[in-house]
Amino acid sequence: MFYPEQFDVIIIGGGHAGTEAAMAAARMGRQTLLLTHNIDTLGQMSCNPAIGGIGKGHLVKEIDALGGLMAKATDQAGIQFRTLNASKGPAVRATRAQADRVLYRQAVRMALENQPNLMIFQQPVEDLIVENDTVTGAVTRMGLKFRAKAVVLTVGTFLDGKIHIGLENYSGGRAGGPPAISLAQRLRELPLRVNRLKTGTPPRIDARTIDFSQLTQQLGDNPTPVFSFLGNVKQHPQQIPCYITHTNEKTHDVIRNNLDRSPMYTGIIEGIGPRYCPSIEDKVMRFADRDAHQIFLEPEGLTSNEIYPNGISTSLPFDVQMQIVHSMKGMENARIIRPGYAIEYDFFDPRDLKQTLESKFIHGLFFAGQINGTTGYEEAAAQGLLAGLNAARYASEEESWFPRRDQAYIGVLVDDLCTLGTKEPYRMFTSRAEYRLMLREDNADLRLTEKGRELGLVDDSRWEHYCRKLEMVEQERQRLRNIWIHPNSNNLNDINNILKMPLSKEANGEDLLRRPEMNYKLLTSLPLFSPSLEEPQAADQVEIQVKYEGYIARQQEEIEKQLRNENTSLPVDLDYRQISGLSNEVVAKLNDHKPSSIGQASRISGVTPAAISILLVWLKKQGLLRRSS
């Protein structure tokens, strides 16, 4: 039977991609349905209990700037907050938080259940309704059919998921979760390229059986960072420490002696695992010269005794896992309460997607999260938000939107995926962005909140907060520009005591702030330049904008040069064999990738500047030389 109500957007899957997609579509006023196999696991942190990190924290801030959920949920659930790379420049500073799994899940569920225009329904999805190359709905296990104008697939590792522990394996979407076998089979019937990937998780340890007195304690930062631009330290629950131990030669011997029982090293697992989050087996074999690896013991929550040993992801048999754990300092008597495992699952080639995350071949069908070959909660959430907003715009026949590489890490993420594809789980790093100085955590709202408001993603309270911050920053910069000091001024001694070279010519507050030995706090502690802003976000923004103004201006010039042909559209169905002058290699690569713009084409390995020139000439001759916004 058909459900009596028709929806604008259906989201299939309630993980980090699905929840952001559902919230985005509903915030934009579309009637949205979230289908999940289990309402109790909405927003579940299936692997490590942490949000953020290098590159990943930038994504979370961007999601937040667009009105998303992840940062706000983390502020309500974070039990330890740190700023990584704090001693480095602002471009690579990143926020990371340990999160209480239960509190995080509760925060996500509460947000979903209180979101207008959003209905949640518990049933596994087994089929899609596709008519004339257009998706029109979904079918659940009990045969109930839902109609919608757009569908977003956010199914994580559940598609034909297979869990491996040693040489044993069984079907599963994650430990304790069923696989989506029927849906996987249905998707394989569609004209989409599909492959397998693998990820893994470590065994969980009972904290009561660890001797923490032998271990190095790792505390959070003071003052404590917040994730959301609307966040406040008062929202944080109790803060607790993590601990550090190390593997050793005994650990490595145990692993080397049991590789014949590893599903990875015996060829049972065929999927490729994440390069930047390798299993402990991989680390020991790939870095044979290392006699130790650092392992972080991360609490799973305030009301749980479970510890997540970050760094020993493994699919070795359980008896070997016990030997590995017991070989490490402080863990000699530790008890494993959940075994580690690897999981293989289907993913679909993201080169078959537009940068809006809509399929190039099935209208109205969007993909987000691990189904696109990424790894990580943050990467999934970012894709979910983008897919959700574009599904909402598709449903109301509005023009789609996605950020460029110079506008957001979300733009870097989708451009990398849709242009280059991936053969291993893709993870975000700051090093993937050409314009890092423009794409900082601190200015994510300045880059994206205005666009989010225009798209209908940003509510009144966030918009008012953003406008107040903008006003504070501009007023403070104007104030500093208007205060001048001269070499013969009476109160010069205080300033010269801070400056490495005494002031030799007149300068205003911004001139002084540009000096490397000066910072905003020091400057505004001087009577002439006081008082300082009370809002830390605005104060940080003033200092960064002033100190890096010249560098930012130069990077902006580079961006403008690069954008001249970036958005020149290419027909998605173009057969490049018909364009004379292109080499066979270039033709093969362009036909394989099917880029949607000259910018995308230029980033494909082997596509030369000469080939780009040929494409531009061909487009001009065909009357197709136009630039999309």
UniProtKB/Swiss-Prot annotation:
GO molecular function list: flavin adenine dinucleotide binding
Keyword Aminoacyl-tRNA synthetase tagged: no
Positions of FAD binding: 13-18
Needed cofactors: FAD
Gene3D superfamilies attached to this UniProt entry: FAD/NAD(P)-binding domain, GidA associated domain, C-terminal subdomain, tRNA uridine 5-carboxymethylaminomethyl modification enzyme MnmG/GidA
Listed GO CC annotations: cytosol
Pfam families, per database record: GIDA, GIDA_C_1st, SAM_GIDA_C
Name of the protein in question: tRNA uridine 5-carboxymethylaminomethyl modification enzyme MnmG
UniProt keyword Nucleotidyltransferase present: no
Subcellular location: Cytoplasm
Source superkingdom: Bacteria
Record keywords, A-Z: Cytoplasm, FAD, Flavoprotein, NAD, tRNA processing
Similarity annotation: Belongs to the MnmG family.
Single GO BP term: tRNA methylation
Role according to the record: NAD-binding protein involved in the addition of a carboxymethylaminomethyl (cmnm) group at the wobble position (U34) of certain tRNAs, forming tRNA-cmnm(5)s(2)U34.
Annotated InterPro entries: FAD/NAD-bd_sf, GIDA_C_N, MnmG, MnmG-rel, MnmG-rel_CS, MnmG_C, MnmG_C_subdom, MnmG_C_subdom_sf
